[in-house]
């Protein structure tokens, strides 16, 4: 006696659904493996190259004005020009700089308004010259500011700080990383004697800056 097996449309639908699900799983697994491998390769390249932080040095700081409006209001008018070098020490990694803001400081007090520098790209082991003319108009300062400036004048020098904040992105081949915030801090010793009345007051020597990412 022969046997006849009959498969209902319902069973066929289930079988087809299983095949479609398996195909989707295979595609998902293939793409997941591909992207995981790609990310692993990028990570390994990153570890091998290990980008070094950029180097900054303040070559000159010139003070054109640093005056309190009145001794009672403690408002400061100032103008300072800064010149610094930026170096990318990496042999195979480029750097994009974005949203650069720079200002001058004295004893932890901001003595100029922030000035923005144009974004730029720095190639392997490249050195760039950056300049910024900073000004401040009626900036509030501490009550002791005038006294501190008088003491600095009697010593013949004043220490001015330069601070820069911004974002950078690493470039390895055609791959560009996400943005990292970085900060640069520099100190400059500027001649500031009693007999020095004609601006600008120039820095005595260049200084190496500290960079944090």
Curated annotation (Swiss-Prot):
It is a single-pass membrane protein. Its main location: other. The chain crosses the membrane at residues 28-48. Expressed in the vasculature of roots, rosette leaves, stems, cauline leaves and flowers. Specifically expressed in phloem. It comes from the Eukaryota. Involved in the regulation of sugar, amino acid and some primary metabolite export from companion cells (CCs) to sieve elements (SEs) in phloem. Required for apoplastic phloem sugar loading in source leaves in order to transport it to sink tissues. Required for correct sugar partitioning between source leaves and sink organs. Keywords: Cell junction, Endoplasmic reticulum, Glycoprotein, Membrane, Transmembrane, Transmembrane helix. The lineage of its organism: Eukaryota, Viridiplantae, Streptophyta, Embryophyta, Tracheophyta. Disruption phenotype: No visible phenotype under normal growth conditions. It comes from Arabidopsis thaliana (Mouse-ear cress). This is NDR1/HIN1-like protein 26. Pfam families: LEA_2. Induction: Induced by senescence. Down-regulated by sucrose, glucose and fructose. Plants over-expressing NHL26 exhibit slow growth, accumulate high levels of carbohydrates in mature leaves, have increased shoot biomass, decreased root biomass and decreased seed yield. Signal peptide: none annotated. GO terms for biological process: defense response to other organism; phloem loading. GO terms for cellular component: endoplasmic reticulum; endoplasmic reticulum membrane; plasmodesmatal endoplasmic reticulum. The keyword Membrane applies. Residues 1-27 are cytoplasmic. Residues 49-213 are lumenal. It is found in: Cell junction, Plasmodesma; Endoplasmic reticulum membrane.
